């Protein structure tokens, strides 16, 4: 199962549509981790399961979603309500409460993935305003049995190889 994860697009429309179209045949689920700054029913968000970010004032997005991808549960949140810029433990504990195996979040605009106490944490970065790295990014998570692979891509669809992460869940 493949899951496209994007976040912090901050008003971009065409780019969201281009990325969705590029990967629509290869992914089973598309997630937007907030700060789209678009209306809830905006056409650019149509293929995505979207949560509310701290810059999403229009629309009625939920603060979090619990999605199923194969046998795995994915917690989707923006991260600002969990203080992810200070610690990942708060969002980890929320995932524990919900029984989630994977946590997708944004807010910091810093692309990366890691396993914390058995839970895969993924921040796809930002396709508008990346931090730390200068490359706009999004991610694709591949789930296979007990293995997960996270690949990151720039806005043009080129893989950012040094961010790839393969883990056991």
From Swiss-Prot:
Its EC number is 3.1.4.-. Mn(2+) 1 binds at residues 8, 10, 35, 109. One of its GO terms (molecular function) is hydrolase activity. Gene3D superfamilies: 3.60.21.10. Pfam families: Metallophos_2. Keywords: Hydrolase, Manganese, Metal-binding. Its cofactor is Mn(2+). Binds 2 manganese ions per subunit. PROSITE patterns: UPF0025 (PS01269). Mn(2+) 2 binds at residues 35, 54, 78, 107. CDD domains: MPP_YfcE. NCBIfam families: yfcE. Belongs to the metallophosphoesterase superfamily. YfcE family. This is Probable metallophosphoesterase YsnB. It comes from Bacillus subtilis (strain 168). The gene is ysnB.
């Amino acid at each position: 199962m493949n899951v496209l994860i994007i976040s912090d697009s901050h008003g971009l429309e065409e780019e969201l549509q281009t990325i969705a179209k590029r990967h629509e045949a290869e992914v089973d689920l598309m997630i937007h981790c907030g700060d789209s700054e678009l209306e809830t029913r905006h056409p650019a968000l149509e293929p995505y399961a979207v949560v509310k970010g701290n810059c999403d004032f229009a629309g009625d997005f939920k603060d979090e979603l619990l999605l199923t991808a194969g046998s795995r549960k994915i917690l989707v949140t923006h991260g600002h309500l969990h203080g992810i810029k200070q610690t990942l433990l708060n969002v980890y504990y929320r995932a524990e409460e919900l029984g989630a195996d994977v946590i997708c979040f944004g807010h910091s605009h810093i692309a990366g993935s890691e396993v914390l106490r058995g839970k895969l944490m993924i921040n796809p970065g930002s396709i508008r305003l990346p931090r730390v790295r200068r490359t706009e990014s999004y991610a694709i998570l591949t789930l296979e049995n007990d293995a997960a692979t996270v690949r990151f891509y720039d806005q043009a669809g080129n893989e950012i190889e040094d961010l790839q992460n393969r883990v056991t869940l």
